[in-house]
């Protein structure tokens, strides 16, 4: 069997897959604190009309504009599907391990898939600037590049712990022309209040979201909000990952997949790979085991409550029904900054609640060790976020050491760790 899939342009789909109509129960609406559903006009304060259309859509297939598709091709899609043969040999497992490698894209992760789409729709509607949050900086880097491509100004509020840990991501964002501020910042009322309480506040994604939204609301209509995870329109943009993988597996002669694995912060990279496999009844009615991996220190799915909660710390967003640790939860400053979010995408929450997706949590030291094992066998150092998926893959694969079964494991290597080297240096 070949170790690497084809990457011809026809592998990139012409549509996005929207899981909402295929969920096992209706998706609860976003609501106000009053309990009333959020109106479309209120969403349009934050997002361009086309993205609101996608957010509330019940169509399973949404066409990708040709301009977006051309940009994705230019930036390196489709991404490779690779067999991790050396990892298999090191683990002495009978399992076959494949990974979709999103780290080949210019900003080093899957985030560019939705950044391009969001920047395109904002540009079409003559938006002047987009404001956003970023954890480890992958999303901020992606939106900075996409904004530059489509002529948008970009303002990024970067979680302070990551701003200090990962200076090269800030440099990359600024190289693409973005303004980058450590969050909490002095640019917003939310940030100033938190800094007054604690000048050394490490920040969180929830706080950075609050700052970005406040910035948009006070912009006088010149700016829109852009986000890298959680909401439906973001997750459906990422479905290109799984749609490509299905085609590539077929071309490699792989007839079934037994495990689909990805890390989870808000849920976009996990959804991007897994949702097409869930919605398309892959394996003819014998679905794979879907494993969603989170940090032990941010156990939204494994220890959180399924209830309505704000998507941000200050309570500026509508309430979303999701697994949550509480919008005021401040995670410790772990290296996987992209996973430091208190909640989980509402659609993924439904899948966890209905036992379609199995959540697991791991401690940071075991995760980083798994990342080093992958680097030493496959030559790619994963981002700390992606190493969570690698840890789960290794645990599953070891169950099949000496076994008669030969399952196929597929996981999303959502990004490389070349701008996260301090995580591995300090751990080892």
Curated annotation (Swiss-Prot):
Matching InterPro entries: Trp_synth_b-like, Trp_synth_b_CS, Trp_synth_beta, Trp_synth_beta/beta-like, TrpB-like_PALP, TrpB-like_PALP_sf
Entry similarity comment: Belongs to the TrpB family.
Coiled-coil stretches noted in the UniProt entry, renumbered to this chain: none
One Pfam family from the record: PALP
Entry cofactors: pyridoxal 5'-phosphate
GO CC annotations, alphabetized: cytoplasm
Modified residues (N6-(pyridoxal phosphate)lysine): 111
Catalytic activity: (1S,2R)-1-C-(indol-3-yl)glycerol 3-phosphate + L-serine = D-glyceraldehyde 3-phosphate + L-tryptophan + H2O
Pathway recorded for this protein: Amino-acid biosynthesis; L-tryptophan biosynthesis; L-tryptophan from chorismate: step 5/5
Superkingdom, natural source: Archaea
CDD domains, alphabetized: Trp-synth_B (cd06446)
Physiological role: The beta subunit is responsible for the synthesis of L-tryptophan from indole and L-serine.
Protein's name according to its UniProt entry: Tryptophan synthase beta chain
Molecular function, one GO term: L-serine hydro-lyase (adding indole, L-tryptophan-forming) activity
EC number assigned by the record: 4.2.1.20
Keywords of the record: Amino-acid biosynthesis, Aromatic amino acid biosynthesis, Lyase, Pyridoxal phosphate, Tryptophan biosynthesis
């Amino acid at each position: 069997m070949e170790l690497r899939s084809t990457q011809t342009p026809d592998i990139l789909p012409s549509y996005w897959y929207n899981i909402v109509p295929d969920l096992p129960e209706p998706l609860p609406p976003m609501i106000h604190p009053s309990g009333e559903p959020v109106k479309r006009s209120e969403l349009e304060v934050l997002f361009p009309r086309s993205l609101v259309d996608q957010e509330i859509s019940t169509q399973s297939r949404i066409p990708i504009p040709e301009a977006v598709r051309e940009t994705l091709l230019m930036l390196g899609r489709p991404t490779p599907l690779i067999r991790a043969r050396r990892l298999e040999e090191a683990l002495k497992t009978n399992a076959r391990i494949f990974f979709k490698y999103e780290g080949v894209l210019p900003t080093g992760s899957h985030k560019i898939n939705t950044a391009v789409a969001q920047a395109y729709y904002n540009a079409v509607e003559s938006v002047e600037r987009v404001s956003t949050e970023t954890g480890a900086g992958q999303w901020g880097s992606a939106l900075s590049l996409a904004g530059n491509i489509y002529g948008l100004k970009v303002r990024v509020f970067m979680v302070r712990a990551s701003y200090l840990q990962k200076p090269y991501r800030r440099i990359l964002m600024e190289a693409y022309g973005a303004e980058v501020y450590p969050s909490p910042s002095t640019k917003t009322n939310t940030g100033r209040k938190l800094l007054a309480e604690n000048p050394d506040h490490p920040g969180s994604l929830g706080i950075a979201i609050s700052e970005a939204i406040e910035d948009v609301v006070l912009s006088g209509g010149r700016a829109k909000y852009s986000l890298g995870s959680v909401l439906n329109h973001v997750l459906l943009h990422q479905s290109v990952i799984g749609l490509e993988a299905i085609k590539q597996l077929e071309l490699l002669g792989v007839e079934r997949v037994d495990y689909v694995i990805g890390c989870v912060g808000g849920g976009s990279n996990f959804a991007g790979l897994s949702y097409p496999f869930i919605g398309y009844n892959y394996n003819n009615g014998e679905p794979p085991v879907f494993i969603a991996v989170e940090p032990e220190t941010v156990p939204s799915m494994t220890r959180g409550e399924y209830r309505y909660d704000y998507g941000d710390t200050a309570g500026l967003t509508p309430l979303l029904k999701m697994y949550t640790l509480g919008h005021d939860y401040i995670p410790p400053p772990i290296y996987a900054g992209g996973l430091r979010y208190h909640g989980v995408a509402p659609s993924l929450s439904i899948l966890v609640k209905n036992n379609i997706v199995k959540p697991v949590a791991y401690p940071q030291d075991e995760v980083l060790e798994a990342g080093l094992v992958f680097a030493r066998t496959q030559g790619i150092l994963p981002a700390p976020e992606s190493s969570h998926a690698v840890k789960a893959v290794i645990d599953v694969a070891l169950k099949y050491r000496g076994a008669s079964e030969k399952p196929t494991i597929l996981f999303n290597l959502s990004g490389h760790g070349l701008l996260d080297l301090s995580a591995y240096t300090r751990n080892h």
